[in-house]
Amino acid sequence: MSTDLYGMATLDACSQIIARLAPIREQLDANASFADVAQAAYFNSVDLSAHGFFSLPGDRCGYDWNANPPENYDGPDNAFRGAAFNYFTQGIAISEVEIDVLSGDHRTIRSDVLVDVGSSINPAIDIGQIEGAFIQGMGWATTEEMIWGNEYNHPWVKPYGRLFTQGPGTYKIPGFNDTPEEFNVELMNGVSNPFAVHSSKAVGEPPFFLGASVFFAIKDAISEARSTFLSNEDQFCLNLPATSERIRMLCGDNIVLESIINDEDMAKENDQSIKEKVFTFQPKGCF
């Protein structure tokens, strides 16, 4: 936001001052320093301050409020309507994790992240922003469980619909031990962006969802564990966040079977139907 808007406004102000200094530069020697040009402009009563302004042009980012809605939002008549963003920041992340099938705990062994930030103005700051957003997204996808009050799952949270987990005192945010043991962040080289100052790109929020690579790696690890305990493995649902409870229960071993199937079920159903219950079982939350 700061670089995109304030940077372009600053560029507008600088362009105004440069235009005012052009006649002064022509009067002076070609090797005159900026200080000499500024001093000469001052004594010639040239205004050395400027008010810059910038707003995104409508053809780059905006909405046509008078446009009629398309008949089919997924159809070709709606494929290229409007411009939601001035530009896009691209990124990719690959993560390797290890899960403990007995406790549901996990550790992130390695994460590799590559992000297109255009021509970075300050690579150190951009890399720090990427690291922070990645960890924040990783926490959102693995530990930060939201609990809402409702009649069926959490009736003790009143009134119904109230968010119980309203801060880090009631949900787990990532700590130092949650950081990938090997964390590699790279910026793409040679990428231009003509729609921002110095060809830069915003990087504060875009890398957030890259943390989901840890979530999908956990799901792959769970799938591998389930293939050990369950035959004829099929697709399964892992709800966000991938808490230790959900990881443990979805591994589908005999301990899990015993915990979710009572004695009456064991008496009425065969082994295969009992195991199939694991495919649809989904822990509702840690509370």
Regions flagged by a language model, labelled:
Residues 169-200:
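Generic long, charged, amphipathic alpha-helical segments
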Residues 2-4, 119-124, 195-207, 229-233:
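Glycine- and acidic
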Residues 1-134, 145-176, 239-287:
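Cofactor-centric catalytic regions
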Residues 216, 221-228, 250, 254-257:
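Hydrophobic alpha-helical segments
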Residues 99, 141, 185, 201-225:
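C-terminal substrate/ligand-recognition segments
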Residues 117, 144, 191, 224:
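Conserved helix-loop functional segments at active or binding sites
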Residues 221-244:
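Glycine-rich phosphate/pyrophosphate-binding loops
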